[in-house]
Amino acid sequence: MALETLTSPRLSSPMPTLFQDSALGFHGSKGKRSKRSRSEFDRQSLTEDEYIALCLMLLARDGDRNRDLDLPSSSSSPPLLPPLPTPIYKCSVCDKAFSSYQALGGHKASHRKSFSLTQSAGGDELSTSSAITTSGISGGGGGSVKSHVCSICHKSFATGQALGGHKRCHYEGKNGGGVSSSVSNSEDVGSTSHVSSGHRGFDLNIPPIPEFSMVNGDEEVMSPMPAKKLRFDFPEKP
């Protein structure tokens, strides 16, 4: 069909008016009309190659025109996209909102710090109250709480350490400390208790033996503080 159309006698006929304007643009410069009159083209006839080239040129020009209509103008601004929703991070303790997870983490760290300070303050108050209670029990002596009782004098103590120290006093008194204290309390013995405190195994009810010192060979002098005067029995004269 295309060959028959190309070889038809209408090709030798003068070019229609529609193709004359296109032929002007084809032979001359683009966008400018030739100065030659239209009658000159009417008298000319197109060859087969020129006709095919003219048809292709018209088709290409028509396609470019439709493409320009479909494309939007470059001067128009692109459509604005809606802003993305900002993520919100809320604190589970005080319900405060933050824009980032890092800010929320720093805020939670302050909560943990304040909680640790409060807990340590509560522990200090508890230890102080327990110390006051212990001191009150040990100062009272005869309080209602008797956790540690001495088996010798039946005194009560708040802690086992205090009871151990108290029993140590009992043991040291048996070894020699108690002898010195009992001798010092007696009125009859007086200052001789300091001399006799180092001796062991004697009865306190028996008065001490007076001490004598030799002065100038034969003179006997009694101690300055005798416990009791000695009596001498002399035989009667006949």
UniProtKB/Swiss-Prot annotation:
Q: What is the taxonomic lineage of the source species?
A: Eukaryota, Viridiplantae, Streptophyta, Embryophyta, Tracheophyta
Question: Residue ranges under compositional bias (Low complexity)?
Answer: 180-193
Q: Name one Pfam family in it.
A: zf-C2H2_6
List where Polar residues composition bias occurs: 1-15
Entry protein name: Zinc finger protein ZAT6
Q: Where in the cell is it found?
A: Nucleus
The entry's cellular-component GO terms read:
nucleus
UniProt gene name:
ZAT6
Q: SMART domains, alphabetically?
A: ZnF_C2H2
Q: What does this protein do?
A: Probable transcription factor that regulates root development and phosphate (Pi) acquisition and homeostasis. Probably acts as a repressor of primary root growth and regulates Pi homeostasis through the control of root architecture.
What does the record note about the induction of this protein?
Answer: By cold treatment and during Pi starvation.
Xref: InterPro entries: AZF1/2/3-like, Znf_C2H2_sf, Znf_C2H2_type
Alphabetically, the GO molecular function entries are: DNA-binding transcription factor activity; RNA polymerase II cis-regulatory region sequence-specific DNA binding; transcription cis-regulatory region binding; zinc ion binding
Q: Which top-rank group of organisms is this from?
A: Eukaryota
* Extra remark: Seeds silencing ZAT6 fail to germinate. Plants overexpressing ZAT6 have retarded growth with smaller primary roots and fewer leaves.
Start and end residues, zinc fingers (C2H2-type)? 89-111, 148-170
Report keywords, A-Z.
Metal-binding, Nucleus, Repeat, Transcription, Transcription regulation, Zinc, Zinc-finger
Q: Where is this region: Disordered?
A: 1-42, 175-202
Q: Which GO terms describe its biological process?
A: cellular response to hypoxia; phosphate ion homeostasis; regulation of root development
Q: Where is this motif: Nuclear localization signal?
A: 30-38
